[in-house]
Regions:
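Amphipathic alpha-helical repeat scaffolds of TPR domains
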Residues: 178-193
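Flexible helix-coil transition and linker loops at the boundaries of alpha-helical arrays
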Residues: 171-178, 217
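N-proximal helix/coil linker or "cap" segments that precede and/or mark the start of modular domains
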Residues: 201-229
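A general alpha-helix detector
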Residues: 168, 188, 209-213
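Sec-dependent bacterial lipoprotein signal peptides
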Residues: 1-8
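A non-transmembrane, solvent-exposed segment enriched in polar/low-complexity residues
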Residues: 10-167, 172
Length: 229
């Protein structure tokens, strides 16, 4: 049973995830593994009256572990054996508010997510600006020429941010070669579109860097084998 895997003190083959979720007093979070073939539920974890929790899990291999408050509100961690992943955030918006300590590769994923969040905020601002000018046009307060000029400007900002997000992923993969975190970076999106295209030369090299780095460091890891297929 899953519960049998939650054994405190097995430092050599387990990790602990703990922390405080503000606004989550007496609620329940859940932990799942993001396995090569998809998510696998591990266990529900109750929060106490202060929103605090602690849970120890025996890992069969290095993998990603998602902590959920709801189906769509979660964070991704990448613990190593013996680590205590210390998480803090808000219940209503964990994915945007969380911080993490005690696990270097979980911190890498946090940094990656922070950059993604910045891009998402800019994208939302651009959409709001576009909608605002469309409403002004309908109200007769601006001309079509003004709307077109604003669209050219926001389109330029969009392309610049998309390119920055892409360059960040390239740099992340290069600087963290051999880390499983590069798998998450590889599939990052901007405006629901993949940033890395394995069919162009730069994207192909990025995929190769991830594949070769993982084969060197984690040749027997299921994530490495799955990615190499």
């Amino acid at each position: 049973m899953v519960a049998a895997l939650a054994l405190a003190g097995c430092r050599h083959d387990s990790f602990t995830i703990e922390g405080t979720i503000e606004g989550g007093a007496n609620q329940t979070v859940w932990l799942e593994e993001l396995a090569p073939d998809g998510p696998i539920f591990i266990d529900s974890i109750p929060l106490d009256g202060q929103g605090c929790f602690s849970y120890t899990y025996r890992m069969p291999y290095r993998s990603f572990y998602n902590l959920h408050t709801t189906a769509d509100n979660y964070i991704v961690t990448l613990p190593d054996y013996g680590e205590t992943v210390d998480v803090h955030g808000r219940w209503d918006n964990l994915s945007l508010s969380y911080t993490v300590e005690g696990s270097p590769e979980s911190v890498l994923l946090w940094q990656l997510q922070q950059y993604t969040n910045e891009g998402a905020r800019l994208l939302a601002d651009l959409v709001d600006t576009t909608n605002h000018y469309q409403q002004l046009l309908q109200d007769g307060k601006v001309s079509q020429a003004a709307v077109d000029a604003k669209k050219r400007f926001t389109d330029s900002l969009y392309r610049d941010e998309r390119d920055r997000q892409r360059e960040y992923v390239y740099d992340f993969v290069d600087q963290n070669r051999g880390s499983l975190s590069t798998l998450i970076a590889l599939y990052k999106t901007f405006n629901d579109r993949a940033l890395i295209n394995p069919r162009d030369s730069v994207g192909e090299q990025c995929y190769r860097t991830v594949r070769e780095g993982l084969q060197e460091r984690y040749p027997d890891n299921p994530h490495t084998r799955h990615f190499a297929q």
